[in-house]
């Protein structure tokens, strides 16, 4: 009798749990208008991610954190082949570590120059390698992945000069620039766009495509609308990235090479922007979209409700849909 009651209680618990989960999924889909997994991922990000923050009362604490990151950045990173399960070559370009894979030695092969995010102070994560590899394998593209110099030890000018040397080498191998794609997320997205402006100033050929995932296009991060979005962003804090921007750019945070929102974007490759509304960079990305519209510049703007910073790198339905759509575009 007792065993039967225990079994009944167990079954009731399972059914109750299933009903609660089902109701939760239904609520998220109907009310939140997003996938359940995207909602769950956001909750987990709030629990486990520690955003970079700055307090005027404790400036030395921020300085210590940056110095700690800088020491780590002095150490070459491990070959990413363990993440992507393909053979990865490692090169040195003017002292800059560069990873290359899926190189068919074909001048007409598509090539992705991927510039990773991390507020210009962090090294790439597994997500960066797996994201670009997924796209590259789908379009049979060569990947060139530089570990560019970062703040606080290095400023943008030094990084641009090293990237220029890398790009000139790419142009020698890929004379058809219609095969070249710049791609980057967050700081790497802003860097991709800023670097394209830099190349235009040098009268160097432009890539065919600029694919920007949640790009940081105004590193001053002083848009008054940001405060309305910060409570919904588990990854970025305005105070932290605004402060770190000074180490990267120096005093002028609004000049176009570091804040491409304020640059002349005519004559560049086609720009594709992917941004979610649970991201403090959303207001500036919307301004970028409006600027491109006003100036009649060909671009693609994909805005996802309630998606987080660089949502395309998360294992969620919305990311899979948008990456697949991007793959189809890049195949053209």
PLM regions: where:
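Intrinsic disorder/low-complexity segments enriched in polar/small residues
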Residues: 1-7, 239, 332
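A glycine/proline-hinged amphipathic helix-loop "lid/cap" segment
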Residues: 3-104
């Amino acid at each position: 009798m007792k065993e039967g009651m225990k079994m009944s209680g167990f079954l009731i618990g399972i059914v109750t749990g299933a009903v609660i989960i089902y109701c939760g999924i239904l609520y998220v889909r109907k009310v939140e208008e997003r996938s359940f997994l995207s909602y769950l991922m956001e909750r987990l990000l709030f629990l486990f991610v520690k955003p970079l923050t700055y307090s005027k009362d404790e400036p030395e604490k921020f300085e210590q954190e940056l110095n700690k990151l800088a020491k780590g950045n002095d150490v070459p990173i491990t070959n990413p082949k363990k993440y992507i399960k393909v053979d990865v070559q490692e090169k040195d370009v003017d002292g800059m570590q560069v990873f290359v894979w899926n190189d068919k030695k074909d001048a007409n092969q598509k090539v992705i120059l991927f510039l990773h995010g991390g507020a210009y102070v962090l090294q790439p994560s597994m997500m960066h390698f797996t994201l670009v590899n997924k796209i590259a394998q789908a379009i049979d593209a060569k990947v060139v992945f530089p570990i560019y110099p970062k703040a606080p030890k290095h400023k943008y000018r030094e990084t641009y000069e090293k990237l220029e040397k890398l790009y000139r080498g790419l142009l020698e191998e890929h004379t058809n620039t219609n095969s070249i794609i710049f791609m980057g997320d967050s700081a790497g997205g802003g860097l991709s766009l800023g670097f394209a402006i830099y190349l235009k100033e040098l009268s160097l050929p432009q890539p065919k495509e600029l694919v920007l995932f949640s790009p940081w296009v105004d590193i001053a991060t002083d848009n008054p609308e940001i405060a309305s979005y910060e409570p919904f962003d588990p990854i970025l804090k305005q105070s932290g990235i605004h402060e770190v921007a000074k180490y990267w750019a120096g005093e002028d945070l609004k000049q176009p090479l570091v804040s491409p929102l304020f640059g002349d974007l005519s004559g560049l490759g086609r720009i594709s922007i992917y941004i979610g509304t649970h991201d403090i960079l959303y207001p500036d990305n919307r301004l970028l979209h409006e600027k491109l519209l006003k100036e009649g510049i060909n671009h693609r703007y994909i805005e996802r409700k309630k998606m987080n910073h660089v949502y395309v790198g998360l294992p969620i339905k919305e990311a899979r849909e948008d990456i697949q759509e991007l793959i189809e575009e890049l195949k053209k």
